[in-house]
Amino acid sequence: MSTTQRIAAILVRVVVALMLAIHGITRIRLGLVDDLGVFLGEHSFIPIPNVTAWVITLVEILGGTTLALGFVVVPLCGWFTIQLAMGVALVHLQHGWFVVGAGEKGMEYSVVLITALIAVALLHYPVRATSQP
């Protein structure tokens, strides 16, 4: 992989990871973690939704930061891919494709993040201890 390709891969990884971390930070700052727990309790099979909401939020913050730094890349990409796919299934799918414009609350943003996470995971597979690429 060339230096330019490495920089591009790192840029995608860092930006996606920081977006996920900011999402968790914002959920805490706005006091929305309990709301997520209520939503999960009403719309999913999760037995302890409030605890799960906190786990999701903390993994977004700590896992997003860890991913941005280039550690535990493949497992974190897997976690976030599953988390986002569940978000698509539970929230966004019923609203269609578009997030804004022709619709709202759609799945297009989540699909882009999922695709980027899969690409980042593939670039780091098999699992390596370093942040390369």
Model-derived features: where do they sit?
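Membrane-interface interhelical connector segments
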Residues: R29-I48
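Extended, low-polarity transmembrane helix blocks
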Residues: M1-R29, N50-L58, L62-P133
